[in-house]
Amino acid sequence: MVLGVVGISYREAALKEREAVINILKDFEANSFFSQHFFGDDGSFVLLLTCHRAEIYYFSKSNRHIQSKLLSRISSLGARPYCYQGLACFTHLFTVTSGMDSLISGETEIQGQVKRAYIKAKTDRDLPFALHFLFQKALKEGKDFRSQVSLSHPVVTIESVVEETLDLHGKSTKDKLLFIGYSEINRKIAKGLSAKGYRNLIFCSRKNISIPYDTVARSQLSFREPYDVIFFGSSESAKDFSGLSLESLASIPSRVIFDFNVPRTFTLAESPKDIICLDMDFISERVQKKLQISKQCTNKEKPFLALAARKQWEVYEKKSSHIPSSQVRASRPKLLIL
């Protein structure tokens, strides 16, 4: 039996490479016959896809060559993936879930992203005990870590990078800002800008929800309206938007566009002269420049997570050794600890 993870993050691959890896990993979700053949009848997987990482956590009872196959598929794209199995896999996910492996150390969004990835996977397909246990314990230990360890508020945030970028391009608090999607990142950016005095904040979401901002219906959305700044954060592609084109985006001179989606909402061979288009690679580079040695102050916290991972790994080994083979694969866990 093998339990492991293969993936890449902002450290190993640029945005273009991460997009290609995400498309390859999504093939496992799109083709159940292919994934069953790849992982075996008793195997399965969970995809963790965020702005800064693309990972596949897998379990297989029979195929011990899965790791090498995954590494080969990802490496063929020019990326340099990492891989962990067993205890190292536990330690990695625990560190990821705690936020200690994030671009901005200690950020909290990753806990929710891991939770949603797990819920999606167990809703879409049967998961074996190993993956249920791994993700339940990672979520529990990540939550415990945040409650027991005092983490200083990040000096550098994505919100601060956005604010500085708007200042750099001459935007003011009177400008009109459009947020596509009521996503977590858009909400954080809007909250930060609102605190800085920005008042013309408008959201456009597919969902009909009550929010503390002005809204525009999707049916009434026009990119030719005088929005000075547009934030794409809805996990949609360009084809999902009526009237979205390079021409419509460039219809407002000096417009600044942030594309937080990975894969990107749209890709441009070169940025037009009349508008400024910025993606997550730009955000990552700006954050890393400001942080310099970004993980220097977090090393002291890692033994805490390593100890928690070892404890849960030992529990997993004991439990899995007593589970009949007929119960290795289960569609519903007995206990969900979030």
From Swiss-Prot:
Cross-referenced HAMAP family: Glu_tRNA_reductase (MF_00087)
Enzyme class: oxidoreductase
Other comments on record: During catalysis, the active site Cys acts as a nucleophile attacking the alpha-carbonyl group of tRNA-bound glutamate with the formation of a thioester intermediate between enzyme and glutamate, and the concomitant release of tRNA(Glu). The thioester intermediate is finally reduced by direct hydride transfer from NADPH, to form the product GSA.
Pathways involved: Porphyrin-containing compound metabolism; protoporphyrin-IX biosynthesis; 5-aminolevulinate from L-glutamyl-tRNA(Glu): step 1/2
Family in the record: Belongs to the glutamyl-tRNA reductase family.
Gene Ontology annotations of biological process type: protoporphyrinogen IX biosynthetic process
Signal peptide: none
Keywords for the protein's UniProt record, in alphabetical order: NADP, Oxidoreductase, Porphyrin biosynthesis
Encoding gene per record: hemA
Quaternary context: Homodimer.
Presence of keyword Oxidoreductase: yes
Name of the protein in its database record: Glutamyl-tRNA reductase
Transmembrane segments: none
Residues binding NADP(+), per UniProt: G181, Y182, S183, E184, I185, N186
Coiled coil: none
Domain notes: Possesses an unusual extended V-shaped dimeric structure with each monomer consisting of three distinct domains arranged along a curved 'spinal' alpha-helix. The N-terminal catalytic domain specifically recognizes the glutamate moiety of the substrate. The second domain is the NADPH-binding domain, and the third C-terminal domain is responsible for dimerization.
Swiss-Prot/TrEMBL site (Important for activity) positions: H92
Organism name: Chlamydia abortus (strain DSM 27085 / S26/3) (Chlamydophila abortus)
Binding site for substrate: T50, C51, H52, R53, S102, E107, T108, E109, Q113
